A protein has these predicted regions:
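Ser/Thr-rich, low-complexity intrinsically disordered terminal regions
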Residues: 89-105, 154-174
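Long, charged/polar, surface-exposed segments that mediate recognition or autoinhibition
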Residues: 111-161
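Bacterial signal peptide processing site
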Residues: 34-36
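Compositionally biased P/S/T/G-rich terminal and signal peptide-adjacent segments
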Residues: 46-55, 69-120
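C-terminal motif of bacterial Sec signal peptides marking the signal peptidase cleavage site
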Residues: 29-32
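Extracellularly exposed regions in secreted/surface proteins, prominently low-complexity, repeat-rich
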Residues: 162-200
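Bacterial N-terminal signal peptides that target proteins for export
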Residues: 4-20
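Second-shell loop/turn segments in exported
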Residues: 57-68, 124-133
Length: 200
């Protein structure tokens, strides 16, 4: 951090007061960010706590198997949506960057990525955008399949012709149907141990 410069005594008294006040405010703000704010603080566990958490997760199965299950669920949802809406098609996103991101999964709150991750199903891209009525049909199918995972808390940020979304979360899972220029389905799972950790 850059040290505050001394205030010249030649400044009028009121200017010195203002300058000192501003330095005090900025030091508090900057100091708070650099000294107190640590995004990893909530994720830190002692060695014993980490071992206990890992042991408690072993019976959930592996990250890799969970990702396969979620991708199978994404396929079921996409097939159901296509069957329910005439002319609708779908495919898994073939963008290599998206595919790599999906394979890598998301970070867990308390364990590092070399131990556990949150699986992400292969991203679904629908062949056509949904009308308002068709979006309701698709969202209802997502709702039904998400409930099987214990995800029942629904939300939506926007519902207009240019942008629609439906999100349902719970039990560590998130299902998101999103439509802007095209319609997509993304599913993220709870935290699972990597297979290599289970094998130890």
């Amino acid at each position: 951090m850059i040290a505050p410069q001394p205030i010249s005594r030649t400044l009028p008294r009121w200017q010195r007061i203002v300058a000192l006040t501003m330095i005090g405010i900025s030091t508090a703000l900057i100091g708070g960010c650099t000294m107190d704010h640590n995004p990893d603080t909530s994720r830190r566990l002692t060695g014993e706590q980490k071992i206990q958490l890992i042991d408690s997760m072993r019976n959930k199965g592996s990250y890799e198997a969970a990702r396969e299950r979620l991708t199978a669920t994404a396929r079921i949802i996409a097939d159901r949506v296509s069957a329910a809406i005439p002319g609708q098609t779908w495919k898994f996103d073939d963008d290599p960057n998206i595919q790599q991101s999906d394979r890598n999964g998301a970070l867990c709150d308390k364990l590092t990525a070399d131990i556990a991750r949150r699986p992400i199903a292969n991203s679904v891209m629908f062949g056509a955008t949904f009308s308002a009525e068709d979006f309701k049909i698709a969202a209802n199918i997502v709702r039904e399949e998400a409930a099987k995972y214990g995800a029942t808390t629904e939300s939506s940020l926007f519902n207009e012709s240019a942008k629609r979304d439906y999100d349902v979360q719970g039990n560590g899972y998130e299902f998101r149907l999103l439509q802007i220029k095209f319609a997509t389905l993304n599913i993220t799972g709870d935290c699972f141990l990597l297979q290599k950790v289970l094998d130890r």
